[in-house]
Structure formats: C-alpha cells, structure tokens
Amino acid sequence: EYYAGGDTDDAVLSVEELVQPDADGAVERGAKVIEGATILAMEGIPGDVRKMLSVMTRSVQEGKIPSASIIQGWQDPLEFLPDIIIDAPLAGKHLALIIAECLKLNALQLNFLVDQSPEYFRTSGKAALLAIHVLMERGGDPSDEELEVVQNLMTDDDKKTFDSAKLMWEANVKK
C-alpha cells in the first residue's frame, strides 16, 4: 500500500503497530519487519528501495524499530543474497544501499558483516565486494577499521587478485 500511496507517516505508524517497540518480543518482530522490507526492496526497482529506506530510517530514528532488529533482520537477506541475485540482478546493489544508510544513521558498524552475519554469506565469495559497495554507497574514504573488515571478508581468490583490501577498494572505486 505504501509503495502505491506514499504516505510515510502512515507507513511508520504501521511499523510501530507491527513491532510494538515497548512490548516484549519487539526485537524479534522488528527483525521480521526489517527482513521482509529488505527482501522486498532487494527484489524491487531503485524507487522502491528509496521508499523503503525513508520508512526504515524514520522508524529507526524515532525508536519504532529497535536497532538490534536490523542485524537480526538481515540474516536471511545476506545468506540468500546469491540466490536472490539470480532473479533480481540489482539485489546486491540495493542491499549495499540499505546497509550504507544504516551506517549513516550510526545504527550499526560495518564489522557486523564479520561478527554477526551468516557463515555462508562470509564464505560464498562476495562478502568483501558487498562491503566495498556499502562503503561506496555511504561515500567518503573508508577508515582503516573498515578496510580491515573488507580484508577479513576477502576469500583466498580475492587475495590472489588483490594484495590488500585497499587495492580491492581502489580497483572498484575506479570502475
């Protein structure tokens, strides 16, 4: 309904009603909202991603979704990213934008990709590249800590191609 009508206030109110941020189980309910909205946005068009982000960022800023729900809600989108990309080739780009917006809100740090993401995501071969795309979407140069995250996500194949996370970053920024 929100994608057609565009009433952000109503959408944020719906999120609050679904999550019930002051009640027991809010983190789990918030995670389900984040998961569903993220997968829907990943499979959508760029305009849908922007609409989802306007609701999500406002919901997080206003305390309608606990920040702990974000990482929990991204477990399946991260784990199944390679499968989602088969049907929705822009899914990785959309997910990078979504994660970058949460970094801008200071709702999380990039190191969650190393510490709190599904193992399959970290070992499937594209985790370092997603981290770079997140940093590119966020803008600015990556910090040493963020490059360390990329380095920790690099596979052996990545390391054969790039001697360091910095070189991998530079190669992708030039594209």
Outline where the language-model segments fall:
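Alpha-helical interaction scaffolds
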Residues: E1-K175
